[in-house]
Amino acid sequence: MCSPEQAPDLFHAVLAGLGQCAVLVRATLRLVPAPSQVRHYILYYPSVEALTADQRLVQADGRFSFAEGEAQLNPNGPGWQYYLEAGAYYDSTPPDDDTLIGDLHFQRGTEQISDLGYYDFLDRLASAVAFLESTGEWYDPHPWWNMFLPGSVTDSFVSGVMANLTEADIGASGVILLYPLRRGDLRAPLLRVPDEPVIFLFSVLRTAAPDSGGALSPDAMLSSNRALFERARDLGGYDYPIGSIPMTTHDWRQHFGPQWPFLAAARQRYDPAGILTPGQGIFKPGPNKRGTELPG
């Protein structure tokens, strides 16, 4: 058993430690009462800059219980359209729409507003999952790319990426996510993020479906992931390591930076034989399950 007070080195090595030091089999979490209803908003924007400006605003004042940004192919023309998906939790009295969205700069007349039960809100992707299971795309390779970006470079970097991104690059069921996080809320030492008050998670969630009409191959998507990773890293971005970016041991040392000695010491103490999660090649070259066979 470990906690911030009991075996704290193991506790902090497990959080964002990518399975290098222990296997988490049980956790104790504090619970809070769940709301009964959610006022659900989808608000459309013409550009990355317009979306992120409102995202920064609603993050700063905390008006929503949930807020996330996405991009989708523009159904009315070339390129992409962007939207803010947000939720305001309540029990008996619905929130006032004008108070929540009256000062935002979305495209008026395109907003979608609905009320959902809390469970229905949490389970709102179930029908999409069922559809992808029925088509087989749920079981195709998903070479995901996820990175934390400094807020100061997010608009220019994301706009540049999106200007050249096509449906073939992400697959017919691919998803683009973009939303801000407060740096101060992320306290796990091994979770590497930019050193700015506001950072953004930018995710290109690809599906390499061979039958989706022109999607790139998994290898091509992995190569693109690597190229995007290097561009973002050079701007101060950090990999959010849940996806498929080919990485070398040197990359991992660079990724963990000043936390590398702590992770290496914890690995030596708790898994000296190197049994746990070797496929990522973090401590020695090997078959990198997040991409391909890589040298050190």
Report each predicted region and the residues it spans:
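Noncatalytic alpha-helical scaffold of FAD-dependent oxidoreductases
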Residues: 1-296
